[in-house]
Amino acid sequence: MSVYKGKCFCGAVEITVDGEPVGAGYCHCASCRSWSAGPVNAFTLWKSDAVTVTKGEENVGVFHKTGRSHRKWCRICGGHLFTDHPEWNLIDVYAATIPEFPFKAGVHVNYAQSVLRMRDGLPKLKDFPSELGGTGETVPE
């Protein structure tokens, strides 16, 4: 089984992710854009039990803008780590947090909110897949 290590910007918090993600892609929602201070968020989705804080758990802060997303960050440097989605039993570990993971996007979600069009041939979902409560509808690139 593969194990990938990650850490915050200053290294006070370290994590591991075990196995392979449930999915990976790009989120274009306003919430992710605002949180990441960028036009798109590269995500990797893991089952909750695959993600472990291995160092500095006392330095992990949390912000709940919604009940669906519990955003975790380092209290020392402010570096973003991951977002826990308890309703789905999934954790979104930002691709940049685990630099050795061979990121390969498979989908764009919330593309209807996109401010950066990406013509890469991947499926573009209007919101979320239907199994996660979205419409599952695709939109043009």
Feature annotation, model-predicted:
Residues 1-141:
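A short Gly-Trp-Pro
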